[in-house]
Amino acid sequence: AFEAGLHVLCEKPAGVYTKQVREMNEAAAKSGKVFAMMFNQRTNCLYRKMHELVTGGSLGAIKRVNWIITDWYRTQSYYDSGDWRATWDGEGGGVLLNQCPHQLDLLQWICGLPKKVQAFCHEGHWHDIEVEDDVTAYLEYENGATGVFVTSTGDAPGTNRFEVDLEWGKLVCENNKLLLYRLSENEREFCKTAKGGFDSPECHVEEVETDGENPQHVGVLNAFTANILHGTPLVARGEEGIRGLTLSNAMHLSSWLHHPVEIPFDEDLYLEELNKRRKTSRKKEATDVTFDTTGSY
């Protein structure tokens, strides 16, 4: 598309593996054309406010990140509906690559990329599939912060709870609300100066006000066309698609190798490991079925 002189809006994920996406980013840079990603969840007022508060620095440094995102429940019928679905050769991954690209993008957009990942990706844990449907990942950041990312397509009912612990409080995004547990003083300073062994800083809970806007796909499309016409900002630059995929690939690679993986990781090694699984990927016949997708996106 870039070689044909076209502007490009890419749906998530940007690709299956980062080496592939890096080539796309290079083609975009050479073309001089507008390149955007369909990261519509960045338009959600709650996540925009989290991004503003965390990156703005008013709450201090990140200490801990926790995201439980398990409200992706899928039946066996869902996986049987396509011969490509949930196969290494056809899709290249499971819940990390299909359901979680938006959350992995938001995680890195709000908190940044970790420096190290240790993940446990359970393949076919809840379904008769060859790719992962249950993942628990431990993250380490450059400043010493840690995190846990949990996802699954086997939990009913599922959970979507995103917590960011910072020096001046904690943000909790859940049930379409953003709560701030605001501390009266910096926890790190309090820890060093408090005289009582069981003292804790004073805390007040408040629901964070937002602008209430959540334009989703329309917002991304409007920003894309406005950028082409007027040069105004995109919701997400296309080159950023590689960042969430970096997290996904690092989790896969860590699980395959059974040890922590540093970011950036060896992209050639990742592709080598993926191709091993592609070669043994099983062929399956799809079931002819029609789904009601209301409320699934």
Question: Where do the PLM segments sit?
Answer:
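Active-site beta-strand termini and strand-to-loop segments that position acidic
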Residues: 132, 137-143, 164-166
